[in-house]
Each structure stands twice: as C-alpha cells, then as structure tokens.
C-alpha cells in the first residue's frame, strides 16, 4: 500500500481506555501524569471518561461506553486522523463481551500507525517522550491512492 504522511500537532489528541479491572490502574496513571496530560485534548470511552474527569478534573470528551459502541467510535476517530495516540489498559486475563470491537480498535490503530500504550510502562515511555510537546510527522496509508487503485 502507498503511504503518505500526516502531522500530529504539538497538542496531541489522546484516547484513554480501560477495561473494568484496569480502570483504577488507568486512574492512578492519569493522576500521576495529570500535568503532562493537561496540555492535550483527551478522549475516553464512556465510563472511563466519566471516572477520569470526576476524579481528576481534566476536560475529557466522553464517547459511548465500550460495549455500547465507544470502541467503534474511537476507531472511527482514528480512521479520520482525529486521534494521535491511545493509552489502552486492557485486561489480558479476562474476555469481555465486546472482544471483537477491542480487536478491531487495536487493528485500526495499527493500520493508521497510531501509537498505543497498553500498560503503565509503555504509557510512561509515551508520555515522557520529547515528541509529546512537538509536531510529529507519521506515515499513514494513502487512502486516496488506495481508492484510486480500486475504482
């Protein structure tokens, strides 16, 4: 597939997602990194967003709850180039009813070259990277070329 680039702005659009058993862990991480997150635009699936906003005071755009379509909403935002990175504390030991949606979300993040942190260690590396405060060019699929080849 042909590639093109898009520029992530200095003020990133960051998705925050956590399965039920990992919501307290994500909340703890967000509290620890509140100062670093304040300069960015934050999005979250429903329940997670409400908890994080209530407990931290951060402005967070809450989508639907994951099982009710929030994961798919987030995937659509990624496809539209509106999400720059994702922190997703998912539960590797327990299946969730919307596992196909979770897999689709991770797949679409990979397709569009969106950085994803899936645990505290990778989230720490991501949030502390110097590029967090800079514009960053990333390679993405050239959808126009893809469409032209297929039509």
Swiss-Prot record:
It catalyses: dihydroxyacetone phosphate = methylglyoxal + phosphate. SUPFAM superfamilies: Methylglyoxal synthase-like (SSF52335). GO terms for cellular component: cytosol. Substrate binds at residues 19, 23, 45-48, 65-66, 98. Pfam families: MGS. SMART domains: MGS (SM00851). GO terms for biological process: methylglyoxal biosynthetic process. It comes from the Bacteria. The active site is at residue 71. GO terms for molecular function: methylglyoxal synthase activity. Residues 6-151 form the MGS-like domain. Its EC number is 4.2.3.3. Keywords: Lyase. Catalyzes the formation of methylglyoxal from dihydroxyacetone phosphate. HAMAP family: Methylglyoxal_synth (MF_00549). Belongs to the methylglyoxal synthase family. This is Methylglyoxal synthase. It comes from Aliivibrio fischeri (strain MJ11). The lineage of its organism: Bacteria, Pseudomonadati, Pseudomonadota, Gammaproteobacteria, Vibrionales.
């Amino acid at each position: 597939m042909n590639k093109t680039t898009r520029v992530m702005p200095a003020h990133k659009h960051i998705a925050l997602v956590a399965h039920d058993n990992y919501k307290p862990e994500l909340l703890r991480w967000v509290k620890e990194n509140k100062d670093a997150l304040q300069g960015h635009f934050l999005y979250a699936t429903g329940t997670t967003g409400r908890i994080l906003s209530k407990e931290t005071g951060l402005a967070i755009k809450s989508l639907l709850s994951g099982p009710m379509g929030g994961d798919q909403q987030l995937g659509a935002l990624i496809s539209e180039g509106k999400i720059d990175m994702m922190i997703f504390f998912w539960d590797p030991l327990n299946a969730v009813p919307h596992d196909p949606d979770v897999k689709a979300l991770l797949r679409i993040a990979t397709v569009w070259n969106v950085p994803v942190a899936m645990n505290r260690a990778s989230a720490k590396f991501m949030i502390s990277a110097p590029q967090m405060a800079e514009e960053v060019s990333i390679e993405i699929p050239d959808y126009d070329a893809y469409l032209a080849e297929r039509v």
